[in-house]
Amino acid sequence: MTQATTRSFAAYQLLLESSTTTGTFVAPCGLTERSVQFTKDLSDTNVPDCDNEDAASWTQRDVVSKSVRISGQGVMALESEPRWRAAYESDQPVNVRINKTGNKAAGGGYWLGQFHLSSFEDGATKGNKVTKTIEMQSTGPVVWTDAAA
């Protein structure tokens, strides 16, 4: 039996552009879960059969828009708190890079786009560490770049 080749948690990174150094991306510490959801909004059109108008029509779908949503949760390092707060307080989007480590043959590369921090939540339970939950929504294109061969 051949096992599937997989990626570790650390090999799937969420990086925010530094607020002080343009073009430098930094992974905020503390997220123990993260996910990226790619969606398309579709428009449905029922297209009839011209030879048999009584037959059920088939639905055809056209892409109207695309969007990417990032979510994450975990404990938040105090060192990461100022960057998240700055991203929320700003009315401008943040440049975000989503890294998948590995070479091109292994599916490595990254997505790059601008995102608004749309949700920023702290939580606390007695006896546990303070938690952080975030959600980011893309604005404009999110472009994939293959890793080097």
Outline where the language-model segments fall.
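Solvent-exposed edge beta-strands and adjacent loop segments
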Residues: 2-73, 114-133
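Viral virion structural and adsorption modules
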Residues: 1-6, 141-149
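Short solvent-exposed strand/turn elements
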Residues: 130-144
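Short, acidic/charged, Gly/Pro-enriched secondary-structure junctions
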Residues: 75-118
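Generic structural motif
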Residues: 19, 41-45, 75-81, 101-104, ...
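Residues within well-ordered beta-strands of beta-sheet-rich folds
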Residues: 71-73, 95-97, 135-137
